[in-house]
Each structure stands twice: as structure tokens, then as C-alpha cells.
From Swiss-Prot:
<dbReference type="GO" id="GO:0000786">
    <property type="term" value="C:nucleosome"/>
</dbReference>
<dbReference type="InterPro" id="IPR007125">
    <property type="entry name" value="Histone_H2A/H2B/H3"/>
</dbReference>
<keyword id="KW-0597">Phosphoprotein</keyword>
<keyword id="KW-0158">Chromosome</keyword>
<dbReference type="GO" id="GO:0005634">
    <property type="term" value="C:nucleus"/>
</dbReference>
<protein>
    <recommendedName>
        <fullName>Histone H2A</fullName>
    </recommendedName>
</protein>
<dbReference type="InterPro" id="IPR002119">
    <property type="entry name" value="Histone_H2A"/>
</dbReference>
<feature type="modified residue" description="N-acetylserine">
    <location>
        <position position="2"/>
    </location>
</feature>
<keyword id="KW-0832">Ubl conjugation</keyword>
<dbReference type="GO" id="GO:0003677">
    <property type="term" value="F:DNA binding"/>
</dbReference>
<feature type="compositionally biased region" description="Basic residues">
    <location>
        <begin position="1"/>
        <end position="18"/>
    </location>
</feature>
<dbReference type="InterPro" id="IPR032454">
    <property type="entry name" value="Histone_H2A_C"/>
</dbReference>
<feature type="region of interest" description="Disordered">
    <location>
        <begin position="1"/>
        <end position="21"/>
    </location>
</feature>
<feature type="modified residue" description="Phosphoserine">
    <location>
        <position position="2"/>
    </location>
</feature>
<comment type="function">
    <text>Core component of nucleosome. Nucleosomes wrap and compact DNA into chromatin, limiting DNA accessibility to the cellular machineries which require DNA as a template. Histones thereby play a central role in transcription regulation, DNA repair, DNA replication and chromosomal stability. DNA accessibility is regulated via a complex set of post-translational modifications of histones, also called histone code, and nucleosome remodeling.</text>
</comment>
<feature type="cross-link" description="Glycyl lysine isopeptide (Lys-Gly) (interchain with G-Cter in ubiquitin)">
    <location>
        <position position="119"/>
    </location>
</feature>
<keyword id="KW-0488">Methylation</keyword>
């Protein structure tokens, strides 16, 4: 007796929903958060997969831009300042995260045109 019931087939190895969808973000955890968050009475099977994919895409986009900002500043480690520069210099991400404050992010370098010294070019 192998304890496998009547079928006698060996049980296949469990495969996570994240690996089935080809994602790094945890589909099961997103599903749990959707259920516990009281967003709706019921949550479909595809909803957490789609949401995990969207979150993974946005994270990858921000990390790529922040990595470029870190490389521009000759740094090998991404700090909150690099995240701030990445988000605020990208038009779409800036619109999406318009009301978000990034701690230790600072501000974009910007000098108003009226504060710059006057151009006194002599053309004679």
C-alpha cells in the first residue's frame, strides 16, 4: 500500500500560481490581500494574476529608471533620491504618483528663469 488512493498515480510536484503565470510577484499573497481587504465579496481567479503582473511591471519600470539615475550619479546602490528623480522625470509615472511623497527623496533641481542673471551681450 502506497497510500495514494485508488488511482495509484504519483502526485505531481506543486507549482505556484506565480510560476505558472511566469511572474516573480506572489499571486497567492495578492489573492489573500484582495480577499481580506473587503474590496468585493468574491474575487475571481484571474484578478490576482493580473494585479500581480501589473505590480511587477510598474516595479520593474521604476527600478530601471532609478538604476539609470544611480548610474548617472556614479553610484552602484539605488537610494530614495534616485527613486524620486526617476519618478519625477518620467511624465507618466509622475502623473500616476503625483500625490506620493518619497521619504528622503528631495526635490528636482529647478531654478526659475527670472532668478537667473541677465544676459548682457554687447552686439556692437
Amino acid at each position: 500500500m502506497s497510500g495514494r488512493g485508488k488511482s495509484g498515480k504519483a502526485r505531481t510536484k506543486a507549482k505556484s500560481r506565480s510560476s505558472r503565470a511566469g511572474l516573480q510577484f506572489p499571486v497567492g499573497r495578492v489573492h489573500r490581500f484582495l480577499r481580506k481587504g473587503n474590496y468585493a465579496k468574491r474575487v475571481g481567479g484571474g484578478a490576482p494574476v493580473y494585479m500581480a503582473a501589473v505590480l511587477e511591471y510598474l516595479t520593474a519600470e521604476i527600478l530601471e529608471l532609478a538604476g539609470n539615475a544611480a548610474r548617472d550619479n556614479k553610484k552602484s546602490r539605488i537610494i530614495p533620491r534616485h527613486l524620486q528623480l526617476a519618478v519625477r522625470n518620467d511624465e507618466e509615472l509622475n502623473k500616476l504618483l503625483g500625490g506620493v511623497t518619497i521619504a528622503q527623496g528631495g526635490v528636482l533641481p529647478n531654478i526659475q528663469a527670472v532668478l537667473l542673471p541677465k544676459k548682457t551681450g554687447k552686439s556692437s
